[in-house]
């Protein structure tokens, strides 16, 4: 693999399969707010980000440029390429198999990202990679490639916390200033608020993450993993007609989801349950897979809305930013929107290009850290599977 990288990265690159150019102006600071210590760049800065903490392998290139008019920094997404490891229905993804996928695709994904951005490796100011949290062996693939590129081209390295990447990309795209953040994905469920250069965790799952809960139930009822189990649950939930009783596990601002998963799985052994090929319009007292998808979503999402509202009340926030793969779910956005509007606030969310794991969010967070002078020596670039969100010093925010 190292030989492939050396041969490949000494050449010039340019196109990729699916990409749009995004351009954003940073929102001008409110004079009443504390001023960010982040200075405007004196020249265009480029960062390449590599993400591979789970089954998504992503690479993106972002630029931060001074505004020609002297206004806020201009942020441009130059490329955002992703390849997903998809397993057969009923199967999850193992770390070793996922790492094998990443090793097979990493050169191709980076090649597409660099070619699409229309830049050379020598143009980059820093290389950012996901340091954690995530699955160990897939994380190591991204870190190894980042180190190799750094050594080949003498480019500084920045290790990025996966969750902070989600938050910073979400803030950039939506122009949300200081919302409560609901971070919901396959490996994480956290309610977060910013304070004193840390993203503070106010509540989280006590056992499994919401995305893991949905994915595991999708496997039980035989849903496909393409494009993702959670998306397929969302689609089938729209056909549900019956809300079955499930335990409701909120504890303060924390949630417990393992018991709900066990309970909804138990309904598949109920004598009233009819599998996909047995559903008909004749029987009345039946439970269908559609009903279970609907019930699981409604119950778990109600819990997420409740703990988010508690955090909002605690810190006096009006707005919510939903990040992470489950944040793409339109029903979750709708339920959160109802709650936020009742409090006179708003919900911010992104589309699948940015809410699902991607390399551009790592590039964004990495470039923010780089602009504050934060880089990593090679010996500090090991991965951290349990890298807490609140362990990161967010030096670029006031």
From Swiss-Prot:
Binds 1 divalent metal cation per subunit. The keyword DNA repair does not apply. A divalent metal cation binds at residues 162, 166, 183, 357. Its cofactor is a divalent metal cation. Its EC number is 2.3.1.234. It is found in: Cytoplasm; Nucleus. Substrate binds at residues 183-187, 215, 230, 234, 329. Keywords: Activator, Acyltransferase, Cytoplasm, Metal-binding, Nucleus, Transcription, Transcription regulation, Transferase, tRNA processing. Component of the EKC/KEOPS complex composed of at least BUD32, CGI121, GON7, KAE1 and PCC1; the whole complex dimerizes. Belongs to the KAE1 / TsaD family. Component of the EKC/KEOPS complex that is required for the formation of a threonylcarbamoyl group on adenosine at position 37 (t(6)A37) in tRNAs that read codons beginning with adenine. The complex is probably involved in the transfer of the threonylcarbamoyl moiety of threonylcarbamoyl-AMP (TC-AMP) to the N6 group of A37. KAE1 likely plays a direct catalytic role in this reaction, but requires other protein(s) of the complex to fulfill this activity. The EKC/KEOPS complex also promotes both telomere uncapping and telomere elongation. This is tRNA N6-adenosine threonylcarbamoyltransferase. It comes from Cryptococcus neoformans var. neoformans serotype D (strain B-3501A).
